[in-house]
Each structure stands twice: as C-alpha cells, then as structure tokens.
C-alpha cells in the first residue's frame, strides 16, 4: 500500500486530511531553463566570472566544483592543495584549491625516477581559492588569487584529463544550482558556456537533468518517517478536532509537501492576524528537516506559531500550495502584512495569492547578507558598513535616503552590483523611511536573534531528524503556552510599579499588558532626556526637532493641527505599536494629559484576545480550552449516532436545543449575581465611609458616644465580610435549582453549541452528519428561523463519503469559531 492509499484508508471516515495531487511535468526545470544551460544561445553582456570573496556554498565539495568550472572556462586544471579539520569536532573547516601547476616538481620526478610521474608540469603557480567554514555550516571564499605564471588554454580545456567525466560534471551542475546563491548560479552558468566542451555538456544536461532535479520533487524523509507523521497527526486530530493538516503528493504518489496547524494557532490568528512572518531559514540549512514556519506575536509580544510545513523545495509551485493551504487553515483571512526573505519565487507567490497584503522583507534577513556579499568591499574600505547603516537608519525622508544611497554606491564603486541595484528597486519592502504606513508589531528587527523568527533556534540544529523534532514539538508548544498563561495571569492580577508621576504612565498601566507597558514606560521616563525645538510651522502642520540626549541624536516629529496626528521619524509607533519619547515630548508641549485613542492599539491591551475574557486567570483559561476540546469530541460522537435514524436525530436535536437553553440561562444567572454582588459591595463601602466619617466627627464627644460609633463601624465591617462567600460562590457554575456547585459537577451537560458574536451554531466539523434542517419546526421561540440561520448550527449530511469523494476539510465557517464568551445572551 503506497502513501496515498494509506492516508485515504485512514482518513476516509472523518475527513480530517487534505490530499492534493498535482502533476508538474516540468517541476523545477525552470531553475535550469532560467539560465539556458545547453544549446547554442550566446551570452550577451559582460559578467565578471571571477570567484569573489564572500560567495558562499553549502559544502566544500560544492566550492571545489565551482572552482573546477571556473578553471575550465579559463583553461587550466585544478587540485586540492590542502584541507584542515577541527580538533574538537573533526569536521572540515578549511580547504585550499589551487592550479595544478601550484608548487614545484620534485627532483625525483623531474629526473624520471618516479614510477608515478605527474602529468602536469609544476611552475610554482600561485593561483588558488581558499575557502573556510562559517559557524552556520556555510563555506565562504576567504581568499582568491587570480594570476598564473603560465599560459592558459581555454579552447583546449575539454581535453584536460580532470574535465573528461562530463556526466559527473552534469550531476555537479545540478547540485551547484541548488547549493549556491543566485549570483553564484549565474556566474557558474556563464563559465559553463565559455568552456571548451560547452555543447556536449549542454546536451547531456538536457538529457539527464530531470533525474537530478527529481530530488526536489518529493520530501526526502528517512525510512519510516512518513508513517510516524501520519500516526502523530491522527492522534492529535483525535484529541482535538480543530487540529488541521494537509498533504501534497506528487504524480508518483510520493509525499512532496506537508502542512499542519494546531487548534491554538488557529484561534490565536483570529485575534492577531495583522502581521505574520514566513520563515524558510531551516529549509536552507537542514536537509533532514526542511521546516518552514508561519509566526506571529501575541499581546505580550511573545512569538506565536501559526503553522508549520515540511517542503521538498523552494519552487513557485511549493510556495503557492503552501500559502493556499495556510489560508484555508486560517479561515481564508489574509494578514495585513507578511514578512519574508527575498526569494523571487516566494515574492511571486505572495503577489498572486495575497494581493491586498503588504509584503515586506525582514530587515535582519537583508542586513545579514551585507557582510557576505560585500566582504571584498569591507576589506578595502573599513567604513563601508558605517556608511551603509547610516543610509538605512539615519535617513528621515525618501529623498535623503536616495541621495545617501547613490553617494555610497558611487563612493565604493558598486554601480554595477546587481544585488545592490535589486535591493534599491525593492526599497519600499525593507527600508524604514519607506514603511511609515506599515505596522510591524516589533517583528522586523536588525538581528535574527532579536526577532520572533528565532522561535525554534535553540531546539533545531543541522543534524536533527524528524523523529527527534516530533518528540520535542509538543514540549516546545507547551512551554510557549505556559509562558503566555503566566503573562496573562500577571497582567490580570498584578499591578505594575509606576516610576513617575506622568499621567500617561498611570493611564497605560491599566490598559497595556505588562510586557508592553514596561516597554512604553521606558519611553515615558526617557522624555526628560529630550529637548524639542520648533523647526517650522504653518496653519496646518508644525515640525519639531527633538534632541535625544540619551541616544545622542536628533529626531524630527511632525504634528498635524487639523487631524491631531503625530509622526516621529524614528518610526517606533510603526515598528512597535506604541509612542516613542520624542512623540510624547510633543504631546506634552501640546497639553495632552492622556494618550489619544488612535495611538493605543487593541492588540497590545489586556482585552486583545477576542475569545477570552480579560479577567480570567491562567488556570481558568487552560481549563476552559480543555472543556471546549472535550465537548467538541463528544459532539462528534453524538453526530455519528444521531444521524443513523430519524428517531435518533430528533432525540439528539431536542437534547441540543434544551442543553443550549440551560447553559445560556446558567450563564445569564451567573452574570446577574456577579453584578448584584458588585452593587452590594459598593453600597457596603459607601456606608462604611459614612460611618467612619461620623466617628471622626464625634472625637470631642463623650467616651460612650465614641464606643457607639466604633460598634457601628464594626457591625458594618462584619456585614461586608458576610458578603464575601457569595462573591466567591458566584464564580462557580450554577445548576437549574439555584444550587451553586463546582464546574466539575455540571460538566456532563452537553453544551454542544458554539456561540459566535451573533446567534448560535454548532461547530461544522463536529455536527457534519445532522443534515439540513429547513423542514424542522421552531423548537424554542423561533430559535430556527430559516435555512440561513441554521447553516452555522449544523452541517450537511455527508458523514459517509459518496463515490469520487475528494478528501478536503470543510472550513468555510471556521473563521467565526472561538471559545464562548460569558456575556449575557438571550434566545
């Protein structure tokens, strides 16, 4: 039984897996076609074919193949001069490749006494390429010596002995295309075109290329990994019906791509779908675990995992399938902003599938490439990075950035650098001054270690296997959820310490979550280090230059008088979502005693999560999620039994309607008692205050009067204490006879209905078998009014799949699924 048959046989009864088979006969061939390897197409343009310092490779073998192809294009042969291993790990860390004429011929060989004479005469040529291994595992060109002391013969390169194994060269061509950067690929292809055996290599490439590219057409898992994945997903799906996963098979029924998202990820996305980061870092450096992640941040600025994928490659087809699948899992709701790397296929997929989403590059991803791409410039000019950073971070306007950029390009002779030109062309996606209208929730940082993309960094290493990852996956998520629960509890039950008399600090201490408040508090305290100076002013706008003594820099702040809007050129509000000290300084000058509401983002507040009440503690939240999952599972069982016959169906339906009414009445009674307790407590405090005031007024009267006043105060305090048990009891569940008991006593009630913001419905996945109810008469005060009203409560009869059934998840109504609120509701 192949993988698809296995999946279908296991998934056919509960519709829990999405299997997609899409034949792509030319899959990945585009990588080869892009550079026109083979054929008689000539090359136009002057591309520098020399190896450059800073070019990186996945392995030292790939670096040597690259140098071999360069040698072939120039007309010399190569050899491995030396290599070095680490004393600790025993891994290769250093290698030197040289011209075959490097060094001198030993006297024994020159005299003819050696039985193994060298076929290449040594001339003490110094031409070589020195590569070193970086800590991340990549190999980088450390030093390149170009000049030879002998004649080069490019026209006869094909006759060199080391170049005759064309099939090996062809195989290496494909490996190189996957192993090196885009710029390196183009250089390599040009070398092949100019080599002596160009036409032969091209024809063989077109003949055998499909077998090599085939590596990217399926997920390279170890033996047994597919079954482990399937069993793992089946178990999680059984425990929680809201768990989502989808599988992409190629035309040979082999696993190509895989995506999954847990229930909490899908619920969290309902509240925090403004900014999402899509990270493929692990795909690039880990062949055993090519993991792609969708990541967001919650209201505590903690990373949230919004979906995981294992992918066979980074092709256009893969990215299209993955983004489509992720959108389905998230209810079809696209994010406002998505952060990615600069992959061109990924850019095309985002543009096609997320047309209304702002696509940005992660700033750290751009900046980390600068030392690699421009190491040769940095060796000659020590101030290159300083100039580059000044251009990026100290340009306050678009014109100022362009002026500094082209000045830098001219100063360091980079006018023809393709990657730098490409970066400037897409500057709206990553340069801060061009992103003043984009909120990034603090997710775009200058270093990866500071970003939420480091979600799994401490758990994933280059040699980790899938089985090892799955063993850690649950622990990782549990740790994250516990961190969020602790932060929720602290925010709800602890008061942050105030460090100044600022009214802004007092205002936001009761509004922001603790984490965000502490960050905002730093800005409030920093106001004293700011000195504003008005630059210019007209009837609509005023511009201030704020000197920040702590940061030793000046920042421009604009104030719109007509719109009451602030804009600081440090972009803190746009990047992090709260006002900076420079903007607060101007608010203070304008007489604002509170933060304007447009600068208080709900996503950073205590009540940011739409499905969870702000006053609930961490333990209550965890218990509530468990109850919800348990009810979903039981609802599925009820649906299976209730759809067998009309009689069973009517029994199940009456039970659902009656149970829903009981739960709604119980929640309403609970809320009414809570409000009553609140009013009683308020009245008690008022009477107590009046009594204490009377005690103070009678200080000069007789001792008898003093004692009487004290007795009255004591009686009122006892009255207040007698009300405390009622307040405590009101937090427990209540049965229909008015008895207040713990939640566990009433968990058996089948609260199978899931309340949205308006109306009531049953989770589509749990009640799929109940069928259409347009023929059912109203049961409770027009509870069922029409077919549309019923669509959210029950699904269509489709429990046993008909012939030719396509295995897909019914997700049309998932976007409204969330935990019930506890506000009063009326049927």
UniProtKB/Swiss-Prot annotation:
Residues 65-154 form the FAR1 domain. The FAR1 domain is involved in direct DNA binding, the SWIM-type zinc finger is essential for transcriptional activation activity and both the MULE and SWIM domains are essential for dimerization. Keywords: Metal-binding, Nucleus, Zinc, Zinc-finger. It comes from the Eukaryota. Residues 107-117 have a biased composition (Low complexity). A zinc finger (SWIM-type) spans 555-591. Induction: Down-regulated after exposure to far-red light. Subject to a negative feedback regulation by PHYA signaling. This is Protein FAR-RED IMPAIRED RESPONSE 1. The gene is FAR1. GO terms for biological process: far-red light signaling pathway; negative regulation of leaf senescence; positive regulation of circadian rhythm; positive regulation of DNA-templated transcription; red or far-red light signaling pathway; response to far red light; response to red or far red light. Belongs to the FHY3/FAR1 family. Its main location: nucleus. It is found in: Nucleus. Homodimer and heterodimer with FHY3. Residues 275-371 form the MULE domain. Residues 103-126 are annotated as: Disordered. Disruption phenotype: Elongated hypocotyls and reduced expansion of cotyledons under continuous far-red light. Reduced protochlorophyllide levels in darkness and less photobleaching in the light. InterPro entries: FAR1_DNA_bnd_dom, FHY3/FAR1, MULE_transposase_dom, Znf_PMZ, Znf_SWIM. One of its GO terms (molecular function) is DNA-binding transcription factor activity.
């Amino acid at each position: 039984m192949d993988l698809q048959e296995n999946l279908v046989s296991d998934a056919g009864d509960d519709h829990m897996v999405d299997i997609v088979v899409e034949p792509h006969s030319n899959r990945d061939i585009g990588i080869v076609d892009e550079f026109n390897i083979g054929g008689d197409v000539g090359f136009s343009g002057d591309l520098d074919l020399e190896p450059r310092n800073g070019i990186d490779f996945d392995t030292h073998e790939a670096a040597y193949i690259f140098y071999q192809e360069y040698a072939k294009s120039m007309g010399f042969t190569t050899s491995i001069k030396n290599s070095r291993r680490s004393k600790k790990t025993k891994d290769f860390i250093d290698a030197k490749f040289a011209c075959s004429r490097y060094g001198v011929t030993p006297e024994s060989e020159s005299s003819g006494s050696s039985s193994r004479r060298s076929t290449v005469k040594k001339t003490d040529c110094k031409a070589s390429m020195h590569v070193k291994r970086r800590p991340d595992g990549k190999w980088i060109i450390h030093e390149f010596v170009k000049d030879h002391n002998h004649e080069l013969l490019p026209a006869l390169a094909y006759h060199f002995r080391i170049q005759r194994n064309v099939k090996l060269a062809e195989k290496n061509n494909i490996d190189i295309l996957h192993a090196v950067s885009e710029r390196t690929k183009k250089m390599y292809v040009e070398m092949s075109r100019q080599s002596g055996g160009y036409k032969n290599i091209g024809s063989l490439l077109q003949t055998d290329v499909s077998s090599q590219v085939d590596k990217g057409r399926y997920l390279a898992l170890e033996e047994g990994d597919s079954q482990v994945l399937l069993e793992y997903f089946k178990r999680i799906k059984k425990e929680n019906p809201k768990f989502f996963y989808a599988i992409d098979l190629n035309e040979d029924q082999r696993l190509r791509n895989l995506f999954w998202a847990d229930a909490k990820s899908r619920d969290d996305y309902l509240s925090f779908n403004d900014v999402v980061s899509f990270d493929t870092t692990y795909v690039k450096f880990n062949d055993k675990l090519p993991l792609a992640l969708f990541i967001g941040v919650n209201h505590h600025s903690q990373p949230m995992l919004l979906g995981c994928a294992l992918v066979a490659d980074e092709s256009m087809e893969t990215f299209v399938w993955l983004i489509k699948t992720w959108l389905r899992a998230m209810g079809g709701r696209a994010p406002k902003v998505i952060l990615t790397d600069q992959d061109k296929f990924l850019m095309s997929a985002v543009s096609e599938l997320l047309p209304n989403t702002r696509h940005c590059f992660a700033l750290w991803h751009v900046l980390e490439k600068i030392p690699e791409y421009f190491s040769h410039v940095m060796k000659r000019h020590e101030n290159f990075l300083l100039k580059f950073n000044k251009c990026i971070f100290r340009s306050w306007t678009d014109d100022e950035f362009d002026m500094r950029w082209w000045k830098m390009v001219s100063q360091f002779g980079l006018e023809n650098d393709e990657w730098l030109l490409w970066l400037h062309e897409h500057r709206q996606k990553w340069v801060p001054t061009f992103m003043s209208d984009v909120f990034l929730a603090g997710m775009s940082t200058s270093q990866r270690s500071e970003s939420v993309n480091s979600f799994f960094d401490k758990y994933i290493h280059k040699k980790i296997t899938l089985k090892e990852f799955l063993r850690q996956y649950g622990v990782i998520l549990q740790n994250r959820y516990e961190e969020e629960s602790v932060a929720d509890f602290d925010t709800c039950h602890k008061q942050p310490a105030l460090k100044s008399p600022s009214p802004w600090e007092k205002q936001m201490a009761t509004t922001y979550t603790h984490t965000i408040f502490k960050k905002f508090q730093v800005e409030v305290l920093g106001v004293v280090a700011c000195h504003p100076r008005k630059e210019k002013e007209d009837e609509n706008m005023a511009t201030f230059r704020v000197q920040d003594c702590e940061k030793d820099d000046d920042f421009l702040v604009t104030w719109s008088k007509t719109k009451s809007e602030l804009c600081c050129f440090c972009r803190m509000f746009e990047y992090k979502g709260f006002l900076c000290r420079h903007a607060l300084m101007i608010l203070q000058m304008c007489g604002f005693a509170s933060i304007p509401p447009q600068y208080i983002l709900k996503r950073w507040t205590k009540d940011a999560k739409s499905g969870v009440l702000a006053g609930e503690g961490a333990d209550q939240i965890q218990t509530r999620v468990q109850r919800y999952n348990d009810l979903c599972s039981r609802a599925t069982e009820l649906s299976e039994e209730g759809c067998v016959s009309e009689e069973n169906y009517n029994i199940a339906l009456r039970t659902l309607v009656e149970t829903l009414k009981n739960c709604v009445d119980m929640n309403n009674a609970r809320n009414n008692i809570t409000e009553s307790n609140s009013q009683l407590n308020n009245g008690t405090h008022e009477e107590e205050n009046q009594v204490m005031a009377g005690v103070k007024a009678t200080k000069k009267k007789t001792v008898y009067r003093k004692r009487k006043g004290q007795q009255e105060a004591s009686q009122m305090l006892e009255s207040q204490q007698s009300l405390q048990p009622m307040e405590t009891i009101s937090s427990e569940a209540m049965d229909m006879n008015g008895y207040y008991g713990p939640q566990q006593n009433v968990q058996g009630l089948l609260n199978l209905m899931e309340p949205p913001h308006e109306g009531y419905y049953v989770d589509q996945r749990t009640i799929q078998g109940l069928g259409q109810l347009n023929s059912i008469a109203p049961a409770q005060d027009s509870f069922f009014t029409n077919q549309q009203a019923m669509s959210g409560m029950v699904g269509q009869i489709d429990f046993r799949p008909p012939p030719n059934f396509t295995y897909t998840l019914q997700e049309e109504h998932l976007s409204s699924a969330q935990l019930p609120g506890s506000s009063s509701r009326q049927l």
